[in-house]
Amino acid sequence: MAMGGVLSSLEDCWAKGQLRDLEHDLDRFIRDNLVEIRRVMAEGRGSGTEIARRRFMRGEINDHQLVDFCVRAVLRKRGTCNPRRDIQEQCYEIEKEVWYEGERVQRPVGAERREEIARSWASQHASKWREWRLFQLLYVWEKKADLYVPILTVNDASERKS
């Protein structure tokens, strides 16, 4: 799927309210990880954050841009903001595949076949599923960033002056 298709799909999910759970997860993640995110902003280590920090200190980028870059870096590094929900949703996807198999063969799916289906789903779809989830998270972040920039930059304005 081209990036235009990805963006269109994300906009559709947003409009239908399908990303609300991720909104709540992201809110909790940011609030639970304020110290880590602020540390990344202050120290700028890894994932290009050191360059963003240097540019911020020279006045080349503003608070919002620094926060945006650092939060995106933390999300990319973690790959999730709610591992439990991600696992549950992946299990749900696997259960749908098991159901499809049951419908196809017109009988209950045995434990051994269920395991095969789960392994097959994991090898064929898990990495793309996680990539899509990260796209969703970054999209939600983009939509909600203005709410979090003030929370994350509480102490940063004084740091640039010194």
Region roles according to the model:
Residues 2-162:
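Polar low-complexity intrinsically disordered regions
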